[in-house]
Amino acid sequence: MASKHGVVGLTRTAALENAAAGIRVNAVCPGIIHTAMIDRYAHGDRGIEAQLAAGEPVGRMGSPEEVAAAAVWLCSDEAGFVTGTALPVDGGWTAQ
């Protein structure tokens, strides 16, 4: 957990240091994402996968595409006034 707070601190500091130059700095903080790493961890055991998904308020694991979409949005002009934020892409886990 300390490393995650470190990323948030670095993100905020870098955002403030670079804002005047028009450089935006943000972080994406993914939750449990269904990737090959999860597959290796669960060894194909659907029970383990279900247990991981049950810990998410939305009741499922996220997808790599959902994390990528958040990152693309942060890089887009639509997020032009967003800087210094750590965007959770975690199905509501941090809101608990």
Predicted feature locations:
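Proline-glycine-enriched beta-turn/loop adjacent to the NAD(P) cofactor-binding site
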Residues: N26, P30-G31, T35-A36, T85, ...
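A glycine/serine/threonine-rich, flexible loop-to-helix segment
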Residues: A20, I32-G55
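A short hydrophobic alpha-helix cap/turn motif
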Residues: N18-A21, I33, G62, C75
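Active-site helix of classical SDR
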Residues: S3, T11
